Swiss-Prot record:
This is Large envelope protein. Isoform M is N-terminally acetylated by host at a ratio of 90%, and N-glycosylated by host at the pre-S2 region. Myristoylated. The keyword Transmembrane helix applies. Residues 2-181, 275-348, 399-400 are virion surface. It comes from Hepatitis B virus genotype A2 (isolate Japan/11D11HCCW/1998) (HBV-A). Residues 2-253, 203-253, 370-375 are intravirion.
Length: 400
């Protein structure tokens, strides 16, 4: 019982090849309470055991980092167990496993025929012509360098300025152009969406003004309610589909939409006429005929070059005709008057009245000023829904 036994063992400490199986007995000094060196001496008397010298080094253990009891006892009577700390030099790893640190030498570049075989197909003339391209020179030659073929060695210390100005790859796309290319459409889309939302409120505002004419001095209430389709009190501009006034609301808004489209069409025609794109040639003073072609066919204007469009006066003679520069609004008004007078003969009876009205121009201006002063606030409430259309008209006037 007192010697070493080689029969199989069971339980803790079966693997005898593992040094110090319990993990905290550096010198294998078991306490007598455990029956050391008596009934179970297998570990202390095993001649094949690994003495494991690293177990004598004090380190992080069960008692915390670097904690050593002040006396022996459970850790034995080694110097470390007595609280005597010894500095143990760290054994460096073998050279075979040591990692190489620092910058590795740059490998030798492969020959041009291997890295760029397509370049070998160029002749010397084409190759040198390609090198003259500023984009190619910027890739391979430093700023201010020469193309003599002599390559200066790179300095040991990289300059901050040269690292910024040097180009190591393909030219970077100008981010300012990319930003402006994205911001432009986004701003146009945002402005268009804002104007669209404002324009969509025009029919509702005009519908409210239209229905308010029937309720002077009172709040507008839908008159389409009856016993057959009882609905709650609501405004005539927001009738539900079950209300009999719903069809009238749709009809009013349809008429308002047609009026808005007609207004936009008139503005577009006036704009095109101002640009000289419409064959609008009114009656010429002292003549009863109009020209048959657009104003652009005129070759001899009456008053030289003018920024205003010129309209033809008579049929061309010898390839030339007489043209007069006139305001676009006057030309368009004359065109509409001629078109209407041909189809409605009774309009010719209004000509004397119009001439008399034009002759009273000072009185007309004073009357217009007085009416605007008197009806200005009420007219502003009528014109206010059309204010969002003004930016659109301005953009069309500028860019068309």
């Amino acid at each position: 019982m007192g010697g070493w036994s080689s029969k199989p063992r069971k339980g803790m400490g079966t693997n005898l090849s593992v040094p110090n199986p319990l993990g905290f007995f550096p010198d294998h000094q078991l306490d007598p309470a455990f029956g050391a060196n008596s009934n179970n001496p297998d570990w202390d008397f095993n001649p094949i055991k690994d003495h494991w010298p690293a177990a004598n080094q004090v380190g992080v253990g069960a008692f915390g980092p670097g904690f050593t009891p002040p006396h022996g006892g459970i850790l034995g009577w080694s110097p470390q167990a007595q609280g005597i700390l010894t500095t143990v030099s760290t054994i460096p790893p073998p050279a075979s496993t040591n990692r190489q640190s620092g910058r590795q030498p740059t490998p030798i570049s492969p020959p041009l025929r291997d890295s760029h075989p397509q370049a070998m197909q160029w002749n010397s003339t084409a190759f040198h012509q390609t090198l003259q391209d500023p984009r190619v020179r910027g890739l391979y030659l430093p700023a201010g360098g020469s193309s003599s073929g002599t390559v200066n060695p790179a300095p040991n210390i990289a300059s901050h300025i040269s690292s910024i100005s040097a180009r190591t790859g393909d030219p970077v796309t100008n981010m300012e152009n990319i930003t402006s290319g994205f911001l432009g459409p986004l701003l146009v889309l945002q402005a268009g969406f804002f104007l669209l939302t404002r324009i969509l409120t025009i029919p509702q505002s005009l519908d409210s003004w239209w229905t308010s004419l029937n309720f002077l001095g009172g709040s507008p209430v839908c008159l389409g309610q009856n016993s057959q389709s009882p609905t709650s009190n609501h405004s005539p501009t927001s009738c539900p589909p079950i209300c009999p006034g719903y069809r009238w609301m749709c009809l009013r808004r349809f008429i308002i939409f047609l009026f808005i489209l007609l207004l936009c069409l008139i503005f577009l025609l006036v704009l095109l006429d101002y640009q000289g794109m419409l064959p609008v040639c009114p009656l010429i003073p002292g003549s009863t005929t109009t020209s048959t072609g657009p104003c652009k066919t005129c070759t001899t204007p009456a008053q030289g070059n003018s920024m205003f469009p010129s309209c033809c006066c008579t049929k061309p003679t010898d390839g030339n005709c007489t043209c007069i520069p006139i305001p676009s609004s006057w030309a368009f008004a004359k065109f509409l008057w001629e078109w209407a007078s041909v189809r409605f003969s009774w309009l010719s009876l209004l000509v004397p009245f119009v001439q008399w009205f034009v002759g009273l121009s000072p009185t007309v201006w004073l009357s217009a000023i007085w009416m605007m002063w008197y009806w200005g606030p009420s007219l502003y409430s009528i014109v206010r829904p059309f204010i969002p259309l003004l930016p659109i008209f301005f953009c069309l006037w500028v860019y068309i």
